[in-house]
Swiss-Prot record:
The gene is gN. It is found in: Virion membrane; Host membrane; Host Golgi apparatus, Host trans-Golgi network. Pfam families: Herpes_UL73. Its main location: virion. This is Envelope glycoprotein N. One of its GO terms (cellular component) is virion membrane.
Length: 102
């Protein structure tokens, strides 16, 4: 029996490249190099509220629209997808090798 070599990730590589390109061009806005005075004032006010003794986990809600939270979620999704692809590949190869050797 000849071994058939296939490229299992041939379709995934262009999709990952497009996703990375979209992320780098779409998430980073061109004109947002520095915050305005109103944004800086609201940031200072938010920091004062965050560090006050009345702020605890019950009263402070994290924002899912910040760059850091979006980046963390995308990283989490990427790690989950990469782990799933790796585990499928390893399990499939082990399964095929077990079938061929027995």
């Amino acid at each position: 029996m000849g071994k058939v070599l296939r490229k299992p990730f041939a379709k995934a590589v262009p999709l990952l490249f497009l996703a990375a390109t979209w992320l780098l061009t779409g998430v980073l806005p061109a004109g947002a190099s520095s915050p305005t005075n109103a944004a800086a004032a609201s940031l200072t006010e938010a920091q004062d509220q965050f560090y006050s003794y009345t702020c605890n986990a019950d009263t402070f809600s994290p924002s899912l629209t910040s760059f850091a939270s979006i980046w963390a979620l995308l990283t989490l999704v990427l790690v989950i997808i990469a782990s799933a692809i790796y585990l499928m590949y390893v399990c499939f190869n082990k399964f095929v090798n077990t079938l061929l050797t027995d």
